[in-house]
């Protein structure tokens, strides 16, 4: 008897469970609204699911739902496989949402209702992900994709310099001509060599393209240029830019015979005025010759600078500068003791990227240029030097003629013994009374 009763209870329990499975109800909208607060902002309207039963006439109704929490917990493990098989036959269609009155009446009518979420519940999210991030994530998550199979288009600016270094590539694929960059790019199809295409376009690239267009427009209409327009970024510092790889943009080593080009540097006007004011004060105190002052005053023009460089290279000019430096009152002894500073700044589109080695090179170059210009300024012009040499030769000739005349003329002695004049004197007294 006990076994028969137990079997009957088991059969009735299985039949009730099958009836509950056939009379499955969709989830309540009220429960989904309370549990999906954040998802509601990015999801489409909720879909109500309706299972297909073997008996199509057996429609869903509120009265036929007899699901309880106890029965659901006991039968969830046994019917998991059956639910997964029936999930493939689910029809998805949009149902009109229930009103608040119907929800309230249903909850009061059937308080034992329990929400069951189907296993095939899918949410359709809106696509707010950027394409570059989406493509990058798909490549990272794909185990079969290699970096050699991905065609990456790098940026020309330092915003992606970390990516270039991480991949071990010194030059990017975008360091091509400007015409190729501005032309519309057609990405290759996936069938071409089986590679993907990723493009990186940074904010610095956008500014660079804008400035290049502004520069091209400004060259055509230079007379009507806007003074408020920002300067171009042609010399922008970038490892991947092909402009800096040219020899013209590389810093040249310092040399004593060659001076830096005129268009690559400029002289600070405040230091110039201070230097020339110091030289005028030294000249007023009684120090220098007229040739050095004229050389210092005329050394501003480019023609005089070329002349001073020629005088420096010639051996005669170096000898004259050595001779003038040996004088006690020369300007070389005054100015070498207190060297004047002079700075040269190379024109570049971006500041703050120069290394310490370049700064030291520029300082050494400035010292050499300053020393050369000081020596060339102290060298006298050829006209003044010739005049000084001619005067010196004339004085020597005059002294020689006087000495010859003295040797050839007879000597006269003084008759007055009390006279203290020398017997070898060139001028003797003819009258003995005049010595008294």
From Swiss-Prot:
Low complexity: bias regions: 211-226, 238-261, 282-299, 401-436
Q: Which GO terms describe its cellular component?
A: cytoplasm
Ranges of biased composition (kind: Basic and acidic residues): 7-21
List where in the cell it is found: Cytoplasm
- Signal peptide coordinates: none
Query: What biological-process terms (Gene Ontology) are attached?
Result: cellular bud neck septin ring organization; cellular response to heat; establishment or maintenance of actin cytoskeleton polarity
As stated in the Swiss-Prot or TrEMBL entry, residues carrying the post-translational modification Phosphoserine are: 53, 61, 102, 172, 299, 301, 303, 325
- Alphabetized UniProt keyword annotations: Cell cycle, Cytoplasm, Phosphoprotein
Q: Where is the composition biased (Polar residues)?
A: 171-183, 300-312
What ranges does the record give for the region Disordered, renumbered to this chain? Answer: 1-34, 165-195, 211-266, 282-360, 389-436
Other remarks on this protein: Present with 2200 molecules/cell in log phase SD medium.
Give the UniProt family note.
To yeast MFL3.
Q: What does this protein do?
A: Can suppress the synthetic lethality of the hal3 sit4 double mutation when overexpressed, suggesting that it is involved in the G1-S transition.
Name of the featured protein: Protein VHS2
Taxonomically, what lineage is the organism? Eukaryota, Fungi, Dikarya, Ascomycota, Saccharomycotina
